[in-house]
Amino acid sequence: MAKEKFDRSKTHANIGTIGHVDHGKTTLTAAITTVLAKRSGKGVAMAYDAIDGAPEERERGITISTAHVEYETDNRHYAHVDCPGHADYVKNMITGAAQMDGGILVVSAADGPMPQTREHILLSRQVGVPYLVVFLNKCDMVDDEELLELVEMEVRDLLSEYDFPGDDVPVIRGSALKALEGDAEWEEKIIELMAAVDDYIPTPERDTEKPFMMPVEDVFSITGRGTVATGRVERGQLNVGDEVEIIGLEEEAKKTTVTGVEMFRKLLDYAEAGDNIGALLRGVSREEVQRGQVLAKPGTITPHTNFKAEVYVLSKEEGGRHTPFFSNYRPQFYFRTTDVTGIIQLPDGVEMVMPGDNVEMTVELIAPIAIEEGTKFSIREGGRTVGAGVVASIQK
């Protein structure tokens, strides 16, 4: 069987289903693949069991079960993630194992918003899922129109509470199970949902279009030529002759010009996101640039020491701590390529954090690092990972 060619002409977006346990996330995922495959003849219908039996993956030492499915509408190609358990969602969103350009929030019309509905909305806000579309599921079980309107209002209020535009978010009423069973009236609702996703979730800006940034992994001198910083370009493009800033670990950023770009010992005119390169830096001594700093387009990223973060603390079984920790705990924070010591403050009313918990915390690093909202990090202690986090907001 020849492999199908990936169609690049369509724009691509990463999305996922979120919401309370048993509200129908996986059934909806199966229904989307089934209805779209049936209507367009493209893509593969996935059964509930195939999605639900997702294999475990390890992301930064953390065990996560995630199902990845793909499907396409007339306008777009989608990669869709669905997680079986609540803990898997928390881990997935915090580690960025599956970056989402948007999410489908599934709420059972029969039950209304539940604790995990709230928690997933909060997580989406914290980790930077920019857009949510709501699927009000199990509407076939609710005869009362007023009740549906009440649930919809509740969901909209909840979204607004976490700074999503609750009044504008599309809410589609449907039944994933009925659609999956082939009921034409409910199949239409799946088509309606995907039209809303196509329309409401903007085409994501690809990494190559963003401002240039490369974490420095290694530095060496070439006699007679200068200093070379190596690393993998995280985003954007770098052209020979571009001015860049060296940021992090020092109070002051230093400006320099890139006089050469090499990949696999060959000279390039430019490098882009995903390339492993060496950048030759004009007028910079080997001592002035080090692992843990980043090269970036001037003015696009600044070094910070204080931030709020959403963190998942590894369980004992995942190789994490065996005991809780408290405020003023001082582990290492591993950003991109380096460790920096940081001091943790827990929120008011949170006495301690147990292994396996997720928590919002404030961190103060002892040296400034190039960070922004959405930057991922690991928390380490004696060389082993004890937590994973994402910067939710910069304080200083």
UniProtKB/Swiss-Prot annotation:
EC id: 3.6.5.3
Keyword Transport in record: no
GO molecular function: GTP binding; GTPase activity; translation elongation factor activity
Binding positions (Mg(2+)): T26
Top enzyme class: hydrolase
Positions of the UniProt region annotated as G5: 175-177
Pfam families listed in its UniProt record: GTP_EFTU, GTP_EFTU_D2, GTP_EFTU_D3
Record region (G1): 19-26
Name assigned to this protein: Elongation factor Tu
Organism: Halalkalibacterium halodurans (strain ATCC BAA-125 / DSM 18197 / FERM 7344 / JCM 9153 / C-125) (Bacillus halodurans)
Source organism phylogeny: Bacteria, Bacillati, Bacillota, Bacilli, Bacillales
